[in-house]
């Protein structure tokens, strides 16, 4: 069985890579690729559209506290931990068809709690929508958790965004908890209060609107070759700034839809 699952058609669809973090490895719209693809030697954080679980963005010093205990995560970005424990892990394929797949994995040894995550991806070739659903479940104990997605959209393209506020970040690109009026780009910043759904407009006038029930968005447009629009269930360093607690009875579930027009 192939590790790459192709959904939809050549004109509109996506591919999901089970070996590399259950990420979208391809997004095809009007027959053209819209995501940065894999190249030999590329960092696992630098291509496709990958799930970020159980944290999104940086965790300061890779350290957080929960119920009176301090935990240390493995560091994978200098002095900090970033983007979770499963974006570079192999996932199991639970089911697959020509338009839908479900993948699952545990959060692994790099996470101090027993927990699992599923990623469902569905393609609607008529409405031209790719829908992704992440669900993270604690196995026994309570734990903090975040989910999100990190799409790398290929340039040439431009962003259309409108947010009420952005977090103030420090020299480590980590929010300090304060918010301010959004500044002009370029950005590597977390925004809240979306007044409209973010949109990526490609040079051939294809428009991809990103809809999500996540209430935080990281916008990263500093690279020359790509734009990143990242829906997240909380801010970077969210275990400290805005912890969301998951229990065996209350999993965390969020959705992202990529809508092409």
Question: What do these predicted regions represent?
Answer:
Residues 43-50, 74-77, 101-105, 181-185:
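Short Pro/Gly-enriched beta-strand edge/turn motifs at strand-loop
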Residues 206-261:
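Active-site pocket scaffolds in enzymes
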Residues 62-65, 133, 150-152, 226-232, ...:
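Active-site scaffold segments
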Residues 69, 75-125:
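Extended, loop-rich substrate-binding clefts of extracytoplasmic carbohydrate-active enzymes
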Residues 1-71, 75, 196-212, 250-261:
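Beta-strand-rich N-terminal accessory domains
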Residues 141-146, 151-213:
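Active-site/ligand-binding surface loops and adjacent short beta/alpha elements
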Residues 65-69, 94-100, 122-129, 157, ...:
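A short, structured loop/turn motif at beta-sheet edges
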Residues 16-18, 105-153:
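Acidic, contiguous internal or C-terminal segments within carbohydrate-active enzymes
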């Amino acid at each position: 069985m192939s590790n790459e699952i192709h959904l939809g058609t050549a004109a509109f669809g996506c591919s999901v890579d089970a070996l590399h973090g259950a990420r979208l490895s391809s997004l095809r719209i009007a027959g053209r690729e819209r995501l940065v693809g894999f190249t030999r030697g590329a960092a696992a954080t630098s291509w496709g559209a990958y799930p970020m679980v159980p944290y999104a963005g940086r965790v300061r010093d890779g350290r957080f506290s929960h119920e009176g205990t301090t935990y240390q995560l493995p560091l994978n970005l200098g002095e900090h931990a970033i983007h979770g424990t499963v974006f570079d892990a192999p996932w199991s394929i639970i089911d697959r068809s020509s338009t839908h797949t479900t993948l699952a994995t545990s959060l692994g040894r790099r996470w101090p709690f027993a927990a699992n995550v599923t990623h469902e991806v569905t393609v609607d070739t008529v409405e031209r929508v790719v829908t992704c659903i992440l669900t993270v479940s604690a196995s026994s104990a309570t734990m903090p958790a975040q989910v999100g997605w990190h799409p790398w959209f290929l340039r040439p393209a431009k962003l259309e965004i409108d947010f009420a506020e952005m977090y103030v970040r420090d020299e480590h690109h980590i929010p300090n908890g304060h918010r301010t009026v959004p500044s002009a780009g370029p950005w590597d910043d977390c925004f809240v209060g979306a007044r409209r759904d973010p949109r990526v407009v490609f040079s051939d006038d294809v428009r991809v609107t990103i809809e999500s029930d996540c209430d935080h968005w990281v916008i990263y447009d500093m690279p020359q070759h790509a734009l990143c629009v990242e829906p997240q269930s909380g801010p970077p360093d969210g275990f400290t700034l805005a912890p969301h607690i998951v229990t065996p009875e209350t999993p965390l579930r969020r959705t992202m839809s990529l809508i092409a027009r």
